[in-house]
Amino acid sequence: MPSFDEALQRVGEFGRFQRRVFLLLCLTGVTFAFLFVGVVFLGTQPDHYWCRGPSAAALAERCGWSPEEEWNRTAPASRGPEPPERRGRCQRYLLEAANDSASATSALSCADPLAAFPNRSAPLVPCRGGWRYAQAHSTIVSEFDLVCVNAWMLDLTQAILNLGFLTGAFTLGYAADRYGRIVIYLLSCLGVGVTGVVVAFAPNFPVFVIFRFLQGVFGKGTWMTCYVIVTEIVGSKQRRIVGIVIQMFFTLGIIILPGIAYFIPNWQGIQLAITLPSFLFLLYYWVVPESPRWLITRKKGDKALQILRRIAKCNGKYLSSNYSEITVTDEEVSNPSFLDLVRTPQMRKCTLILMFAWFTSAVVYQGLVMRLGIIGGNLYIDFFISGVVELPGALLILLTIERLGRRLPFAASNIVAGVACLVTAFLPEGIAWLRTTVATLGRLGITMAFEIVYLVNSELYPTTLRNFGVSLCSGLCDFGGIIAPFLLFRLAAVWLELPLIIFGILASICGGLVMLLPETKGIALPETVDDVEKLGSPHSCKCGRNKKTPVSRSHL
C-alpha cells in the first residue's frame, strides 16, 4: 500500500500546481507583516502638541490666536534638558487662577496672559486631558491622547496584539487540526478583514484594543495555516526552502509598508490599507484546495484522491489506479504534557534553551523594529532600509546551515545581534553612518536567529511530541512580543539607548546557550524521546532511521 509521500512524488512534489498555490499563499506573509509591525506607523509620536486647558481655549478664541500663537503664549517654558519644542506637553498653566471670578479669562491680556500673575509665574498643574495637536487624528496617539500619563497605552496596543497572536496560536491551531486547514485559513482572513475595519473606525480606545486583540487572533490563524498548507502539499526536500521563502515574503511586507504609510496621511487610512487585502484572500476558496494529507488523516480519502488527481493533471502527471489506497503515518500520542518535555536531561536542556531563544528573538526583533519610531530621523527611509537588510539573512541561512550545520550559524547570528546592539548604544551620535551600519548588522543577525529557531525547534523534538513542543516553545515568542513594547518605551524614557543594552545582553546570552544544543545537521528526525537523548553522541546519526514506532494507518 503506497504512502502519501510516494503518491506526492508521483503527482509531482513541486510542480506547476504547488508553485501556484505557494505563490498565492506567500502573499499572506506580506499582510501578516503589515499587522505585525504596523504600530510603528499607526502610533507615530506627533511632532507638535501641547496641553490646552479650558481657560487657554477660551482665551485663544477671544484673542483670535493661531495655534502657534496660542502655544507660544500659554504653554509652559521648557525645563531641564527638555528641548523647547516639547514645552507644555504634560503640564499647563492654571490660567483660571488669575482671579476667582467665573470670567477669569477676561482679566488676561491677549498680548501677555502671564502678566496677570506675580512675576509672570502662573501655577503649573499636570495635564489630564485636552491636548491639542498640530495634526489631529493623524495617528492613534493623537486620536486617543496616548501621551504623558497615558503613554503606556501605546505599549498596550502592541502587547494586546501579541496576546491575540498567542491566543490564536492555540485556539486556531487546534481548530485547523480538527476542522481543516483551508476552512480556518479563510475564516481567519475574513476575521482579519472585519476586525481590522472595526479597528479603523473605533469610536474609543477600549473598542480599538478589543478588536486589535481579535485581529491578532485571526492574523495568527492566517499565518499558521498558510504555512502548514504549503509545507503539506510539497515534497519533503522542498519544505525547508519553502519555509524560508515564506518568511522572505514577510520581509517584503516590511519593505512595502513605509511606502503605504508615506502616501496615506492618517492612521485610519493606513489601517484600512493593510486590512482590506485580507478580503481578497477569500477568493482562494476556488483555487487553493484542502490539504490532502490532512484529509487522509480525517478518513476523507475520496476528497484527498480528487485533489491528488487535480494536482497530477495540472503538473502534467498521471496518478494510476495503484494509488487508490494511500496510507499516512499519524503520531500515536495523546495528551502530551509539559512534563514530557522536561522529564529527561537532554529534552529538558533543549526545551529550556529553545524557550529562551524564542523569547529573545521576539523581544530583540520587535524591539529593534519599534525603536525606529522613537529615534528620530526619516522613519520611512530607515524602516525601508531595515527591511531590505533582512533579505540577505535568508540567503545566508540557505548557504550556511547545510555546510556549517545549525548550531554555529544560530549562535553566531545571536552574538552578532547582541554585540551590535551593545556597540550601537555607546557609539557617539555624531558618527551616524557608523551607528546605522552597526545597527543594521544587529537587525540582520536577529532576523537570521528568528528564522533558524523555526528550523532547529522542529528538528530537536521527537515525532510524538513535535507539534506540541514547537507550539509551546514558540508561545514564548508571542509572550516576548507582549513584553517588548513595555521594555522598549519605558526604558527609553529613562535613557534612549538603555533598551539596546538589554537587547544586547539577552542576545549574547542566547548565543552562548544555543551552543549547548546538539547539532542536527545530517541527522534524521528523532522519533522517540530516547532518540533525542542520544543526540550529540557518536551514534546519533542513526537516530530515527531504524527505529520503529507504533503507528495508526489512515487510508483511502
Curated annotation (Swiss-Prot):
Sequence motif Proline-rich sequence, location on chain: 289-293
Entry keywords, A to Z: Cell membrane, Glycoprotein, Ion transport, Membrane, Mitochondrion, Nucleus, Transmembrane, Transmembrane helix, Transport
pH effect summary: Optimum pH is 8.5 for agmatine and MPP(+) transport.
GO molecular-function terms, A-Z: monoamine transmembrane transporter activity; neurotransmitter transmembrane transporter activity; organic anion transmembrane transporter activity; organic cation transmembrane transporter activity; quaternary ammonium group transmembrane transporter activity; spermidine transmembrane transporter activity; toxin transmembrane transporter activity
Protein origin, superkingdom: Eukaryota
UniProt subcellular location: Cell membrane; Apical cell membrane; Basolateral cell membrane; Mitochondrion membrane
One BP term from GO: epinephrine uptake
GO cellular component terms, semicolon-separated: apical plasma membrane; basolateral plasma membrane; endomembrane system; membrane; mitochondrial membrane; neuronal cell body; nuclear outer membrane; plasma membrane
Catalysis performed (reactions): (R)-noradrenaline(out) = (R)-noradrenaline(in); (R)-adrenaline(out) = (R)-adrenaline(in); serotonin(out) = serotonin(in); dopamine(out) = dopamine(in)
Outcome, altering V363F: Decreased TEA uptake
Tissue localization of expression: Expressed in liver. Expressed in intestine. Expressed in kidney in proximal tubular cells. Expressed in placenta. Expressed throughout the brain, including cerebral cortex, cerebrellum, substancia nigra, medulla oblongata, hippocampus, caudate nucleus, nucleus accumbens and pons with low levels of expression detected in nearly all brain regions. In testis, mostly localized to peritubular myoid cells and Leydig cells, and weakly expressed in developing germ cells.
Membrane topology of the entry: Multi-pass membrane protein
Glycosylation sites: N72, N99, N119, N322
Classification via Pfam families: MFS_1
Transmembrane segments: 21-41, 182-202, 241-261, 269-289, 381-401, 468-488, 498-518
Role summary: Electrogenic voltage-dependent transporter that mediates the transport of a variety of organic cations such as endogenous bioactive amines, cationic drugs and xenobiotics. Cation cellular uptake or release is driven by the electrochemical potential, i.e. membrane potential and concentration gradient. Functions as a Na(+)- and Cl(-)-independent, bidirectional uniporter.
Additional information: Mediates the uptake of clinically used drugs including neurotoxin 1-methyl-4-phenylpyridinium (MPP(+)) and platinum-based drug oxaliplatin. Plays a role in the anticancer activity of oxaliplatin and may contribute to antitumor specificity.
UniProt similarity note: Belongs to the major facilitator (TC 2.A.1) superfamily. Organic cation transporter (TC 2.A.1.19) family.
Domain notes: Contains one proline-rich sequence (Pro-Glu-Ser-Pro-Arg) that is required for transport activity.
Name used for this protein in its record: Solute carrier family 22 member 3
